[in-house]
């Protein structure tokens, strides 16, 4: 048995870490030994930067474009991609079985995951990754500089022996990361660059609610923005509040993101509170103040306007 990508020729044709000017192509695979009823045993999702552009699962046996890519003609031969993913599914699940056999646990519930892909900057290859995990722990990864598979789990030593049984497999893995994957990414960008380079500014609202004890929670919500990077925090008397929790940035489900920050304010605190937002969609920072003159009840909304 050989690595998932190396067991058959690539069915994709040649091509005609992210920072500004960089693009990356990533594949995420998940295999389950005992999936819940109706849940696929194997799933694969491909991403261009942080945007999913096709999905495959073992229930349908089809690779299908998602989001705006479902409207793009000629980007991929989806029947050939489906064939490729079905072959990868079979090999991926065999690897999961081999690991379970090593640990003499052939009936347990286990998860095997893979991530591989590449990045280009200024139209040149600038990075790559290929690694696997078993039950959430690092299992094995490929070092393209050596090149070799590096075991990160006792069972992975056997996997390494199988995957390096012939030297050609190691060289093909290196070639995939350094040549084939970047060329594939360049080809996809011919259909995707305008979508990936777009800038959607956030819509910002502030809500307020009273909590037990009489204090009020101000919530500053930014949503519908792209790209993902955003700075969002509360200020009081021109000082950043360090005590509000970090909320992170979350996908909206439509290719954009949302984030929020909250602050607890006592009725006696009359200082002005501002929510400050920085995003590439704004030419300058957006500052939004809660209007204390409003006759507020629970969940009143203020829509942000640039100042």
Swiss-Prot record:
Disulfide bonds join 118-181, 220-275. Coiled coil: none annotated. Keywords: Disulfide bond, Glycoprotein, Pyrrolidone carboxylic acid, Secreted, Signal. Residues 202-287 form the Ig-like C1-type domain. Its main location: secreted. The modification Pyrrolidone carboxylic acid is found at residue 18. Stimulates lipid degradation in adipocytes and causes the extensive fat losses associated with some advanced cancers. Belongs to the MHC class I family. This is Zinc-alpha-2-glycoprotein. It comes from Mus musculus.
């Amino acid at each position: 048995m050989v690595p998932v990508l190396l067991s058959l020729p690539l069915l994709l044709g040649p091509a005609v870490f992210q920072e500004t000017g960089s693009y990356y192509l990533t594949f995420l695979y998940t295999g389950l030994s005992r999936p819940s009823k109706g849940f696929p045993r194997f799933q694969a999702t491909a991403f261009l930067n942080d945007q999913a552009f096709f999905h495959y699962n073992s229930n349908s046996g089809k690779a299908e474009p998602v989001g705006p890519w479902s409207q793009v003609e000629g980007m991929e031969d989806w029947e050939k991609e489906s064939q490729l993913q079905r072959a990868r599914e079979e090999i991926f699940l065999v690897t999961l079985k081999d690991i379970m056999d090593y640990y003499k646990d052939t009936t347990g519930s286990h998860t095997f995951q893979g991530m591989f892909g590449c990045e280009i900057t200024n139209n040149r290859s600038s990075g790559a990754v290929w690694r696997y995990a078993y039950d959430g722990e690092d299992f094995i990864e490929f070092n393209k500089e050596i090149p070799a598979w590096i075991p990160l789990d006792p069972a992975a030593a056997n996997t390494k022996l199988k995957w390096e049984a012939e030297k050609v497999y190691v060289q093909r893995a290196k070639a995939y990361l350094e040549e084939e994957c970047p060329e594939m990414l360049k080809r996809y960008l011919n259909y995707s660059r305008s979508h990936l380079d777009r800038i959607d500014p956030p819509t910002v609202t502030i809500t307020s609610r009273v909590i037990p004890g009489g204090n009020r929670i101000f919530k500053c919500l930014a949503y519908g923005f792209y790209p993902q990077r955003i700075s969002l925090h509360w200020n009081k008397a021109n000082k950043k509040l360090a005590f509000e929790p970090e909320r992170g940035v979350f996908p909206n489900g439509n290719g954009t993101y949302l984030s929020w920050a909250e602050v607890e304010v006592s009725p006696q605190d009359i200082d002005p509170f501002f929510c400050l937002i920085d995003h590439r969609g704004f030419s300058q920072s957006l500052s939004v103040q809660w209007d204390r003159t409003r006759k507020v009840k629970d969940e009143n909304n203020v829509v942000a306007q640039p100042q």
